[in-house]
Amino acid sequence: MDVTNVLLKPVLTEKVYFNQMGETKKYVFVVNPKASKTRVKLAFELVYGIKPLKVNTLIRKPTTIRGGSRFPGLSKLEKLAVITLPKGIAISVTGEAPEKTDKPADKTTLKESTVKEIKDTKNSPEAVVKTAVEALQIKPTAAPVTTAPLQTVAVKVAKEVKEVKVEKPVKVEKPTKPAKVAKEAKTTKVAKETKAEKSVQTTKVAKETKTEKSAKTTKTTATKTTKTKTTKKEVKK
């Protein structure tokens, strides 16, 4: 069996990380199921260059897996090797690159060459200031703009405001349209006609009700008289 086919992949779990907190650190690898402990030791020495203190092997049996179909599946059979290292020795299993601790230099710091030039030069102080400004990359500020005093500006503005006169807008009454006037006259006429018709109808109904009531009263009186006459005839007999 080739040594390269013994250590397949590392196992990275919380339990493994917890075992790596102490002085004696333990690492777990998925191993070829046909490999023995001696094979695992040799493979580890060739890959990492460290002799392990102890090697223990475990067999992880297949378990049922519920997949997308209704029939459950099974996981693969795996053989694990727990390798313990001597005290004070550790390895990087993940293969991650170490973090960079170098910080970028500040922009305001001077370069070493410019500082030496400033110290060595025996010229006037103006040249020294120029070299320092170029090293710091400072842009010179613009010259201040000369402005007139505030009092004179305020007087000018006040004069201009007095001279300017704002004319108020005059309200213009809009002429009424003849169509609207005609519509209003029609509506008033219709209202008057409807009121007159309603009054005539109410008077007619009142008269009819009075005549009907008088006719009913006459009928009732006539029936009463006939009844009295018949009763008198019966008594005489």
From Swiss-Prot:
Pfam families listed in its UniProt record: Ribosomal_L23 (PF00276)
UniProt-annotated stretches for the region Disordered: 174-237
Residues covered by region (Unknown): 128-237
InterPro entries associated with the record: Nucleotide-bd_a/b_plait_sf, Ribosomal_uL23-like, Ribosomal_uL23/eL15/eS24_sf
Keywords on record: Ribonucleoprotein, Ribosomal protein, RNA-binding, rRNA-binding
Domain of life: Bacteria
Entries under Gene3D superfamilies matching the protein: 3.30.70.330
Single GO molecular function: rRNA binding
Comp. bias regions, Basic and acidic residues: 174-198, 205-215
GO terms classed as biological process: translation
GO cellular component, one term: ribosome
Annotated region (Large ribosomal subunit protein uL23), positions in chain: 1-127
SUPFAM superfamilies tied to this protein: Ribosomal proteins S24e, L23 and L15e
NCBIfam families, A to Z: PRK12280.2-2
Family: Belongs to the universal ribosomal protein uL23 family.
Known partners and oligomeric status: Part of the 50S ribosomal subunit. Contacts protein L29, and trigger factor when it is bound to the ribosome.
Function: One of the early assembly proteins it binds 23S rRNA. One of the proteins that surrounds the polypeptide exit tunnel on the outside of the ribosome. Forms the main docking site for trigger factor binding to the ribosome.
Protein name, UniProt field: Large ribosomal subunit protein uL23
UniProt source species: Mycoplasma pneumoniae (strain ATCC 29342 / M129 / Subtype 1)
Gene: rplW
